[in-house]
Regions:
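Perimembrane loop-to-helix junctions flanking transmembrane segments
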Residues: 1-8
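Short coil/turn segments at secondary-structure junctions
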Residues: 9-10, 45
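Interfacial segments of alpha-helical transmembrane regions
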Residues: 34-55
Length: 175
């Protein structure tokens, strides 16, 4: 194996390195485009970030504690799939914030997360149970985070509105 192919195989998993974050990015993009969401900007930003930190942190701790070998024998960080955990956490965040606007937003988020999971197994980076655990982890932590946020931050009316019109960014603040 050449050095170039080894470095690409070792440090880049390809498209799923980017796709895992797309559902989370979509939460902020849809909100910025003015699509009606469940929560105001502050609560959305705090809750979405907290769900990512809880999911990514827990996946990292489990990977370094359990030390399950990957199917390709490259390292002992197979369980759970962090890519899948992040993708499903983002998909669940997308569903929580925009699922009532259109069910297709939820379908797109979970479809993308499922693609990431299947791709991780197809690339021989994870066993099926690694991605199943990652999906469950991402879903559960996001549900818990949204439940807790409703207890800590009661819903308020939107005080900041951001939107795009043509080539301008519009910001309105309610005082």
């Amino acid at each position: 194996m050449s050095l170039e192919s080894w470095s690409q195989q070792r440090y880049s998993d390809g498209l799923d390195d980017v796709l895992q974050y797309l559902p989370y990015a979509s939460v902020f993009a849809l909100k910025a485009c003015g699509v009606e969401s469940r929560d105001d900007w502050k609560k959305l930003a705090i809750t979405t970030t907290a769900s990512w930190v809880a999911t990514a942190g827990t996946a990292w701790i489990l990977k370094h504690s359990i030390k399950e070998w990957r199917p390709d024998d490259s390292d002992q960080k197979s369980f759970p799939s962090g890519h899948t955990a992040i993708a499903f956490a983002g998909a669940t965040a997308l569903h929580k914030e925009f699922g009532k606007v259109s069910p297709w937003i939820s379908v797109a988020g979970y479809g993308l997360a499922t693609f990431v999971a299947v791709d991780r197994v197809a690339k021989d980076r994870h066993h099926w149970y690694d991605v199943a655990a990652g999906a469950g982890l991402g879903f559960a932590f996001t549900e818990i985070t949204w439940w807790l946020s409703d207890k800590v931050f009661p819903r308020q009316k939107e005080t900041i509105a951001i939107g795009f019109s043509g080539n301008t960014l519009d910001v309105a603040v309610k005082l």
